[in-house]
Amino acid sequence: MNEPTYNYNDFLMPALADGQPDISIEISEITKKQWNQLIGIHEVVVYKDCRKLFPAAKFSVRGLDPALLYSVEICFDVLSPFTFSYNKKLEKWIPTKTPVNCQSSALSSMICETGDWFMNGDMDFGALNITSSHEKAKEKIEQNRIAVCLSSRTMYQIRVVLYEMQNDELIYLKETKFDEMIFITCTEYRGQVNRELKKSMNRFSRKRKYEISGTKCQRSKRPAKLPVESLDEKELKNAEKGIMSLLESSPSSPSYLYQYQYNSPQSIPSSIYDSLYPSSPEEYQMVHTFPQTDQLSPSFQTSPTVHYDFYNQQYYDNSFHENYFQSYNRL
C-alpha cells in the first residue's frame, strides 16, 4: 500500500474574502526582523507553566476610522493534521502519522480600543502567555491576563482578525496571516542556531537576565556534561583539584583555560519548507515518512574556538557575540 503524500499548501486555511482593501495589518519592523531570523527552523517551547511568546507578536494597523471602536483578536491556526518529531540524523522536524489532538485554532483574548489608538502605536501582544495546560491558561484568563493553550509537537501559524464594534456586536472586517509566524511547538529546543538566537535576543532568558541585572540565576538542574572527549581526563581532574593553588601562585593568569573545537551552524534555512520534509529517497528511507517536496537547504558550519574557565565555571565563545559568557549549569 502506497504511503499518503501531503503538500504544505494542503495544511493552509483558505483566506476569507477581503472586503476592506484600505485597511492593512502588518508586523512591526523589529518583530518581523526577529521572526525572519528564525524562519525555517523556528521552535517555540511550551510547558505547563505559562511563559511569554518569543519573538513577541506586535502588529501595526492602518486605514481605520479614528473615532470608531475596533477589536483585534490573535489566533493560532493548526497547519498540519499530524504531529511532528525531530529526526536527529537529518536534523529537521518530520511529520508523523499521529493525528493532532487539539482544536483547529486556539484563540487568545482580544484588544478593544479606538481606531486612533490602534494607528498611533503597535498592537502589542507581548504579554501573551503560552502554555500546554488548559487549567493554567484558564487561571491566567481569570486574572485578566492574555493566555492561550498550545499542544506540543504541533505546527501553528499566527493569524490576526480585525473587528468593528457596533452596539456591543463584533462586525468582521479583515484578517491577515503571516508566513513569518509559522512555528512548531516543542518541550526543548533542538536546533543549535535557534537556541543561540533565542538566548541572545530574548530578554526573558536566563542569560539575558544575567546580562541585564548582573546577578546569576540559581538553577536546580544538574550540570551539563563537559566535552570530555576533547579533554584529557587525568589532566581535567588535576586541574580541578589544584586550581586554587595555581591561581594563588599566578594571580594575573587567565584562570587556567582549556579549549576545544566544535561545529556550530552560522546560518539558518531561508524557507520553512526545506526544514519539514525529506529531500531525497535516502532520507525518506531513514525516516519512513512522506516523500520529498523540496531540495535540502545547504548547511553552513564553521569551527570557532570555545574556552572553558574551571574557576569561574563559564564558557567563553567569541564566535557568536563579543564577550559572550554562558553559565556552566546550562540547559
UniProtKB/Swiss-Prot annotation:
Keywords: DNA-binding, Nucleus, Transcription, Transcription regulation. The keyword Cell membrane does not apply. GO terms for biological process: cell fate specification; positive regulation of DNA-templated transcription; regulation of transcription by RNA polymerase II. It comes from the Eukaryota. It is found in: Nucleus. Its main location: nucleus. GO terms for molecular function: DNA-binding transcription factor activity, RNA polymerase II-specific; RNA polymerase II cis-regulatory region sequence-specific DNA binding. One of its GO terms (cellular component) is nucleus. Residues 29-210 bind DNA. This is Putative T-box protein 36. The gene is tbx-36.
